[in-house]
């Protein structure tokens, strides 16, 4: 069910990050060099999840693996235990909570009209539902972390934290962000561009679906304009 996917991606997955923050507070303060294996593992996990996204043909699976890859960055930032790292992790959890939930919602609107989640079979939506394409574009831009979104601010904080801790991590981070941009653009082009396989009887987007997307993306845009609310 789509409601379960949205709650799982937006809230339950982020509770794991919150749990890591709480656990780090009660652990004895040690040098972050002790946590090197865990940080490398988190970044490597993020890259592997991103690479898995590139192989996906199922729309919901792609969005789910995308959530996993972002949580790898969150875990790495939390483990370093610096104010910037914690701020970036908190901001990314909030920003990606909105973004991934919006993407799952859009995937469901696509599924209700095509009755398939295969990317190649859902193409051509911009011809018949242009407003849906606009929502897809905005959600994917947020997922890529384009400025001035909160996703961009949080990833910039995390990148600065990891680079100050160990400059070599910029290679893993850069690779991760490159792959994120690749699969997000692939997802958008696969679902929106090309000639449609649907007949002309496709029902239009309902007001409730527009309202759902507005309630996801407008708060995120407003927080992006005033990030000190969450950072």
UniProtKB/Swiss-Prot annotation:
Recorded family membership: Belongs to the complex I subunit 4 family.
Enzyme Commission number: 7.1.1.2
Molecular function as annotated in GO: NADH dehydrogenase (ubiquinone) activity; ubiquinone binding
PANTHER family (alphabetical): NADH-UBIQUINONE OXIDOREDUCTASE CHAIN 4 (PTHR43507:SF20)
GO annotations of cellular component type: mitochondrial membrane
InterPro entries: NADH_UbQ_OxRdtase, ND/Mrp_TM
Keywords annotated in UniProt: Electron transport, Membrane, Mitochondrion, NAD, Respiratory chain, Translocase, Transmembrane, Transmembrane helix, Transport, Ubiquinone
Originating species: Porthidium ophryomegas (Slender hognose viper)
Enzyme class: translocase
Job description of the protein: Core subunit of the mitochondrial membrane respiratory chain NADH dehydrogenase (Complex I) that is believed to belong to the minimal assembly required for catalysis. Complex I functions in the transfer of electrons from NADH to the respiratory chain. The immediate electron acceptor for the enzyme is believed to be ubiquinone.
Alphabetized Pfam families for the sequence: Proton_antipo_M
Tree of life domain: Eukaryota
Membrane spanning stretches: 1-21, 34-54, 63-85, 89-111, 128-148, 169-189, 211-231
UniProt catalytic activity: a ubiquinone + NADH + 5 H(+)(in) = a ubiquinol + NAD(+) + 4 H(+)(out)
Membrane topology recorded in Swiss-Prot or TrEMBL: Multi-pass membrane protein
Intracellular or extracellular location(s): Mitochondrion membrane
Main location, first listed in the record: mitochondrion
The keyword Membrane is annotated on this UniProt entry: yes
Protein name as annotated: NADH-ubiquinone oxidoreductase chain 4
Gene Ontology biological process: ATP synthesis coupled electron transport; electron transport coupled proton transport
Membrane found in the keyword field: yes
